[in-house]
A protein has these predicted regions:
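Boundary/activation segment at the start of structured domains
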Residues: 1-88
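Caspase-like (clan CD) cysteine peptidase catalytic core
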Residues: 53-130
Length: 130
């Protein structure tokens, strides 16, 4: 089985909105959900404007659980590299005063991916510092 998790976030608070991230996940879904002959390809879960880091992490854990053939994680939204060089993806809930650059460190995501029994793992980040 092939599974995909597509996260696109346009709506960030405090003037940090983006445009096109929801359109991006719609385009990716259209490209991977079915083969050219119309037969099923990827089972797709879309999470537009997901609110919290917890929701994102739960979805990532679920995507890479089990022993499926392929798992694809696509993120379109804000990304950041902190002062230690850690790469971070940024759900909506990180845009609160004093916590803007906390987000989800890629090392946290990669620890889930690297211990997964999924055979083929694909990660696509469409954000700054990806």
């Amino acid at each position: 089985m092939k599974k995909a998790l597509l996260i696109g976030i346009n709506d960030y608070p405090e003037g940090n909105e983006l445009t096109g991230c929801i359109e991006d996940i719609n385009s990716v879904k259209a490209a991977i959900e079915r083969h050219g002959d119309g037969s099923p390809n990827f089972g797709v879960k879309m999470m537009p404007n997901v609110q919290t880091s917890g929701e994102v992490m739960d979805a990532i854990r679920k995507l890479f659980a089990g022993n499926d053939d392929t798992a694809l994680f696509y993120f379109s939204g804000h990304g950041y590299m902190n002062s230690t060089g850690a790469e971070i993806v940024m759900p909506q809930d990180i845009a609160t005063p004093g916590q803007y650059y906390t987000g989800i460190q890629m090392s946290t995501i990669m620890s889930i991916v690297n211990t997964s029994k999924v055979r083929n793992k694909i990660i696509i980040l469409d954000c700054c510092h990806s």
